[in-house]
């Protein structure tokens, strides 16, 4: 166990950040699953806009790497474009 006051504070802060990051990742994953499950192009386009923003936000906050976000957005865009109108 940590002995210093600052170390104890870091433990608390890291735990809070971990929980926040986990929540944001889980929410994004859920929306990605919804997007992949959609069959109507109009709905998929709306969801894609939302998911794209979520991925960008995760990358901006260093929760995921920016290239990881770009790859996911690219694959999702391909998926949406393949859907029949």
From Swiss-Prot:
The keyword Translocase does not apply. GO terms for cellular component: cytosol; small ribosomal subunit. GO terms for molecular function: small ribosomal subunit rRNA binding; structural constituent of ribosome. One of its GO terms (biological process) is translation. Keywords: Ribonucleoprotein, Ribosomal protein, RNA-binding, rRNA-binding. InterPro entries: Ribosomal_bS20, Ribosomal_bS20_sf. It comes from the Bacteria. Pfam families: Ribosomal_S20p. Binds directly to 16S ribosomal RNA. NCBIfam families: S20. Belongs to the bacterial ribosomal protein bS20 family. This is Small ribosomal subunit protein bS20. It comes from Cytophaga hutchinsonii (strain ATCC 33406 / DSM 1761 / CIP 103989 / NBRC 15051 / NCIMB 9469 / D465).
């Amino acid at each position: 166990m940590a002995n210093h006051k600052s170390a104890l504070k870091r433990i608390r802060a890291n735990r809070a950040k971990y929980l926040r990051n986990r929540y944001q990742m889980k929410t994004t994953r859920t929306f990605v699953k919804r997007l992949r499950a959609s069959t109507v192009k109009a709905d998929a386009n709306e969801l894609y806009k939302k998911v794209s923003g979520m991925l960008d936000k995760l990358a901006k906050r260093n929760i995921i790497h920016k290239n990881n976000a770009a790859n996911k957005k690219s694959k999702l865009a391909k998926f949406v474009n393949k859907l029949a109108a």
